Amino acid sequence: THAEGRETISNGSATHAEGYKTTASGKYTHTEGSFTNASGDNGHAEGNLTTATGVNSHAEGRQTIASGSASHAEGRQTTASGAQSHAEGWLSIASGFTSHAEGYTTIASGSYSHAEGHFSTASNDYTHAEGNQTTASGSASHAEGIGSMAIGNYSHAEGNTSVSVGTSSHAEGDVT
């Protein structure tokens, strides 16, 4: 174990803590920066107020949390809580298994879901929401553009405020 800096704590097997008020516990963890905490085995927390509690997790930036196993949170106030999830940007949340949320206030909660852009939500398994205020809630659905919603399973909505409701349906254009 190795601790350097001010008020750092390195407690565990082969841990490393450096900076100001950082804590590395567990096995093979590494923290650096200020007020960082890595407690999941092989976890890494860096930056300011970051926390890596999942096994093999990585949190970086400011106020990020990587709690899922093999998860990665980066940016500002992002949370990666699903196993193998990735959250990046600002206020993004990846809670589904192998989910990916990126941008500003995006949410990927379904397994294998992907939300990107601004206020986009991918809430079911295999969904993809991209753009501004888009929602993909049907299983394996895809919403893109501005305010588009793919509600039906396997549906696709694209454009400006397009809504696709039925199974395997497709809506595109302006307010369709």
Indicate where each model-derived feature is located.
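Periodic small-residue-enriched repeat registers in elongated scaffold domains
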Residues: T1-T176
